[in-house]
Regions:
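N-terminal export signals
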Residues: 2-3, 9-29
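Sequence-structural signature of mature extracellular/luminal beta-sheet repeat domains
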Residues: 30-365
Length: 365
């Protein structure tokens, strides 16, 4: 990722597919002695710089890399990677809302905003205090990512992995009211939920690393492990497994597999039963193929579109890499829009590329 992202847990070099680069070791800052003040407005890659009002033709900011002819069914060889929006400190969790004429919502984790972008209206702040708020919800002395992270549609609204709120949130798309769905497991506060996905039965699966905490071993951390969880439709919370660095998460189109990107140990997959319970954990993509790995999306054909630090890499349902979309700033997440584009959360900006994939969305009653 970028310089700003070097403060995150960088588990590997900016790679898509290929030989492993050297691991970068990041030393976190010490916890402040007094509670932190609310973050100052940061509106661009340079502190105080206003976002750029991009208009078509959008500037190019990346390239498509074809590793296998099967990529042609998903992305044209001459597809352009366009920069449509900037002004983020750290973009995460993009989600497309509506049909072809809809809009994109994206978390700015360190600024505590959710940003809205559409081709017709451009960029605007959709929600301030998206995670940590003025009432101190989600406050911790060592909190460094006050905002939301992963975003999905579900339960009649927007479901957010609230890194700053240290909870899973439901945000009403009309009123923008936040409701905490869960913030504790067995009486102990969650670490900082990172990525989130909806299962076919309405279960919400999420990863919970301590990534939003400056001091990850400090007294505000109540769970002594990082985990992958399932929030059942009845709002009961179940621990699926403990992981070293849980991050991206996704569900297969038939609802029988749960995927997860854990950088230090490689990516894994579980089997899911009809009640959403996970079992039979096994390797999916070896650590030797991708070092690190961030958030991901699964399309309707079962292909995985995974942020692999410097790119979004496309994997077949069997875990074979067939191509990537690389950038010069790194990528944390992506989204398959209903407008025919794949959107990339690329550090300080949003990129897009024409794609033929269709977004996987379960119709949960």
């Amino acid at each position: 990722m970028t310089k700003q992202l070097s403060r995150r847990t960088l588990l590997g070099a900016l790679v898509a597919v290929g030989p492993a680069a050297a691991l970068a070791r990041v030393v976190g800052a010490q916890a402040p002695a007094t509670p932190p003040a609310p973050p100052q407005p940061m509106t661009g890659p340079v502190f105080g710089a206003p976002p750029t009002d991009f208009k078509p033709p959008y500037p190019e900011a990346g390239k498509v890399n074809r590793l296998d002819p099967r990529l042609d069914a998903l992305i044209d060889a001459d597809a352009k990677v366009e920069k449509v929006c900037d002004g983020f400190l750290h973009a995460e969790g993009p989600v497309w809302v509506g049909g072809a004429n809809g809009y994109l919502l994206t978390s700015d984790t360190q600024v505590n905003h959710i940003v809205k972008w559409s081709p017709t209206e451009g960029r605007s702040i959709w929600l301030e205090n998206s995670g940590y708020d003025a009432n101190g919800v989600g406050w911790a002395p060592n909190l460094r990512e006050p905002g939301t992270n992963g975003l999905i549609l579900g339960r009649g609204g927007l479901i957010a992995a609230g890194s700053g709120a240290r909870s899973i949130l439901r945000i009403d798309l009309a009123t923008k009211k936040k409701t905490v769905l869960v913030d504790k497991y067995m009486g102990k506060r969650l670490n900082s939920p990172n990525d989130v996905v909806l299962g076919p039965d309405g279960s919400i699966y999420f990863s919970d690393p301590p990534a939003a905490l400056v001091n990850r071993t400090g007294p505000d951390r109540e769970l002594d492990y990082a985990g992958v969880f399932r929030l059942a439709p009845d709002n009961s919370l179940h621990l699926i497994d403990t992981m070293s660095a849980p991050n991206g998460i996704g569900v297969s189109p038939d609802g029988t597999k749960l995927y997860h990107t854990d950088g230090p140990t490689g990516w894994v997959v579980w089997d899911l039963d009809k009640q959403g319970n996970a079992s039979n954990r096994r390797n999916f993509v070896a650590r030797s193929v991708v070092m690190g790995g961030d958030s991901l999306k699964i399309d309707t054909a079962g292909n995985m579109w995974a942020a692999t630090r410097g790119a979004v890499t496309v994997f077949t349902p069997g875990g074979e890499p067939i191509g990537s979309i690389s950038t010069d700033e790194g990528v944390s997440n992506c989204e398959i829009g209903a407008d025919g584009y794949l959107y990339l959360a690329s550090s300080t900006r949003i990129l897009r590329v024409r794609a033929k994939a269709k977004k996987l969305m379960f119709k949960v009653t």
